[in-house]
Amino acid sequence: MSGSPTDEPGAGLDDVLVLTFRKSFWASREAERFPHRVYGAIVAGHSTNLLNTVLLAVRAAGAIVRRRPRVLLFGSAHRLVPLALVLRRLRILRARLVVTNQVYFGPRWGRHADRVVVYSRRETEGRPSYLYLPIPADGDFAAVAPHAAERPYAFAGGTTLRDFDTLVAAIEGTGLALVIATDNPSDVPAGEGCEVRGRLPLQEFLALMAGAAVVVVPLRDSEAPHGHTTVAQALCLGKAVVTTRGASVEDYVRDGIEGLLVEPGDVAGYRDAIVRLMADRELRTSCEESARRRAPEFSYETFARSLEALCLELLR
């Protein structure tokens, strides 16, 4: 990117309008680097609820008419993006578009955006408007107090496209303890030494992760990107990670450096990787040190500066 962030946050960004809901990065002080932000109100269920999206669209339309921005930056406003892409294709919307989430559209529509921010390099292949940025990891990592347990344990967390069946099978017979935290605990099979917890407050989730000897992110084989947030959180906590090869997280975990990679669905592979990291203190410490060195890549500050540089480039 030819643009570069300035020392003074927000300088040069008067022609950028952010449209988002107040969540994750967009609820942080780092997001205040962008001086003009339109936040949607969450009045019904999840932020992606249609009513919430309609209300944000109304507020966004008013702000666009008033400010006439040259760049529209879509944050956590996933369902609003397809409408913007249609308006851009019809040449009704003239502002340049930066999108940070592609849940509700694919590459066919993505080409109508000036930049689509994605969280793995694999997603940029053959897509000139797609740009890889490391995902910003959610959590106050400095304030995390690691969970204290009677014996070492492996931790796995998350919900989307998780392969907990393979993980639980891998732990069987090892005598190792495993703690799983997921929004859908009923989907996790019962297993020896396995403790399952439901949805947790973020800092409690991170405390369990921080207290683990090893973090495991078992992912299903899928073209859809997934698992980045949990992996980035583990790296920010300086944890050695076992995760799935080819599941779009290889930009985060390099085999033998930040952790170990296993083929999708490979029970024996997961068992060997987990047992190896738990038993080999030297390897585990080396992976933890590498993780800590990578942590700044996933900070809110780094993400904010990268988005700023991107917007400044489009404003040139």
Over which residues does each language-model region extend?
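Donor nucleotide-sugar binding/catalytic pocket of nucleotide-sugar-dependent glycosyltransferases
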Residues: Y104-G106, H112-A143
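Acidic donor-binding loop of glycosyltransferase active sites
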Residues: M209-A224, K239
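C-terminal alpha-helical cap of glycosyltransferases
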Residues: Y300-R316
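Nucleotide-sugar-dependent
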Residues: Q203, V217-Q233, G246, E250-D251
